[in-house]
């Protein structure tokens, strides 16, 4: 069987624009083409363009792009209802005495569309209205046909499995977050319980980098493509409905992923500021430099940036006597790679290299590309803010959404990679649940290690000692 090309490969194809938008209604005044490329259209016409008929099936890239971007204008449940309505009207599936041979011609295409929707955007179906519409449409087109009925069962079973997996993951994250406590609180109540540090758990930086990659890939895998869009969904002035994402059931996996980045940064800073002796702090810094370097080699840019961010936090960077004992040449190279100047030019070059390696990879290890997530979110945000979603004539600016989908589709490919490294539960548990310092506690630990250098720092030190330790 020929392999179905990945979405990102289809988006990158030189023939993409030529093949993608061969419309079933080329003359439709509601869809605007230029050089055979669909640039804009009314929302209604774009919905029509999504619905297959006997002679037409929309391209995968159009399906992905429209399902991703349409939620800026219309809630997925309403879109599903309208797609179902158009489908019923077009094929007259509501009429009594329906010709079964007519249904057999269109049923596979409708089922294929439903399959693509449920596989790519499964979280849409947490909404009970979506699930009802899915089952209702599927019931109408199966029309007693055993083969189609089995296909529908398979679609729904796969969907339920994905949604159950999401629920389990959300419960796990909640449990992990509940176990992760404030280190200062633990120091006061059970100081003996946190005598360990990361090096006593695992002294091999390469293994730690691999375990960080496990966490990254697991958390990436649960992020739905729509989460990049729903983050900046606002009420459309031409739409009377409520905000498309006011629902309580919307996934928050992207938020959880950003929180993981922040946790890792604070864990790094905590581990460096905790040791009493200068040589132990210097050793910890060098350890994390090696972890960060291995993350870079793996293609794990998110953990790399989190580690660098932790080491650049003021409570850590002010430890001048400690840094004087550190061989910083490797750290300087890593900082150069992640330098934010020129819009992160060096990082973007390294990311392109990793993405190219992934395309020609012979192993899962070579396929790993974990982008610096906050920058990806920022890029998508500015793409959304920099281009209007509606044109003056009321048309949807589809040219913008093609660019949006191109960025998100690349992420979709990267998040599907299976981690090739063996899991070490002990390291994973420590990294995810070890108590960490708050920002104030980090400053206090830093001042306790290397005293204040000026009056401002002295005043802050006194305030923190009083507030956190109850000492003058």
From Swiss-Prot:
Pfam families: RasGEF, RasGEF_N
Annotated N-terminal Ras-GEF domain residues: 34-164
InterPro entries in alphabetical order: Ras-like_GEF, Ras-like_Gua-exchang_fac_N, Ras_G-nucl-exch_fac_CS, Ras_GEF_dom_sf, RASGEF_cat_dom, RASGEF_cat_dom_sf
Domain Ras-GEF: start-end pairs: 204-452
Keyword Cell wall biogenesis/degradation: no
Keywords: Guanine-nucleotide releasing factor
GO terms classed as biological process: small GTPase-mediated signal transduction
GO molecular function: guanyl-nucleotide exchange factor activity
Purpose of the protein: Guanine nucleotide exchange factor (GEF) with specificity for rap2a and other Ras family proteins (in vitro).
Protein name as it appears in the record: Ras-GEF domain-containing family member 1B
Organism: Xenopus tropicalis
Recorded name of the encoding gene: rasgef1b
């Amino acid at each position: 069987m020929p392999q179905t090309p990945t979405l990102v490969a289809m988006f990158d194809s030189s023939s993409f624009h030529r093949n993608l938008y061969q419309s079933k209604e080329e003359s439709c005044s509601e869809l605007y083409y230029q050089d055979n490329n669909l640039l804009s259209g009314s929302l209604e016409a774009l919905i029509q363009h999504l619905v297959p008929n006997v002679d037409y099936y929309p391209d995968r890239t159009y399906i992905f792009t429209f399902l991703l971007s349409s939620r800026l204008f219309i809630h997925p449940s309403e879109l599903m209802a309208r797609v179902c309505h158009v489908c019923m009207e077009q094929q007259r599936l509501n009429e009594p005495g329906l010709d079964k041979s007519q249904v057999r011609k269109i049923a596979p295409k409708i089922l294929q569309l439903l399959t693509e929707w449920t596989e790519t955007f499964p979280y849409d179906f947490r909404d009970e209205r979506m699930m009802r519409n899915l089952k209702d449409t599927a019931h109408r087109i199966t029309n007693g046909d055993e083969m189609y009925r089995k296909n529908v069962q398979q679609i729904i079973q796969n969907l339920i499995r994905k949604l159950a997996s999401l629920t389990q993951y959300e419960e796990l994250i909640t449990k992990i977050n509940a176990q992760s406590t404030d280190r200062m609180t633990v120091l006061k109540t059970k100081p003996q319980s946190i005598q360990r540090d990361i090096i006593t758990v695992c002294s091999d930086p390469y293994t730690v980098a691999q375990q960080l990659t496990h966490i990254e890939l697991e958390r990436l895998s649960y992020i739905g493509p729509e989460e990049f869009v729903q983050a900046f969904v606002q009420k459309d002035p031409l739409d009377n409905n409520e905000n498309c994402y006011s629902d309580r059931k919307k996934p928050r996996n992207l938020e959880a992923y950003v929180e993981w980045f922040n946790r890792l940064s604070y864990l790094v800073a905590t581990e460096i500021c905790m040791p009493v002796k200068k040589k132990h702090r210097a050793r910890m810094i060098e350890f994390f430099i090696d972890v960060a370097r291995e993350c870079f080699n793996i293609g794990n840019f998110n953990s790399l940036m989190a580690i660098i961010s932790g080491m650049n936090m003021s409570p850590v960077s002010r430890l001048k006597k400690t840094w004087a004992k550190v061989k910083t040449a490797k750290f300087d190279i890593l900082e150069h790679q992640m330098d934010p100047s020129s819009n992160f030019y060096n990082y973007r070059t390294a990311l392109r290299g990793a993405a190219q390696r992934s395309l020609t990879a012979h192993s899962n290890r070579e396929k790993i590309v974990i982008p610096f997530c906050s920058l990806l979110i920022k890029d998508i945000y500015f793409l959304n803010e920099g281009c209007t979603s509606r044109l003056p004539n009321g048309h949807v600016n589809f040219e913008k959404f093609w660019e949006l989908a191109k960025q998100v589709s690349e992420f979709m490919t990267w998040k599907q990679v299976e981690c090739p490294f063996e899991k070490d539960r002990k390291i994973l548990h420590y990294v995810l649940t070890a108590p960490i310092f708050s920002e104030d506690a980090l400053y206090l630990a830093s001042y306790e290690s290397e005293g204040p250098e000026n009056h401002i720092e002295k005043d802050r030190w006194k305030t923190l000692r009083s507030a956190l330790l109850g000492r003058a």
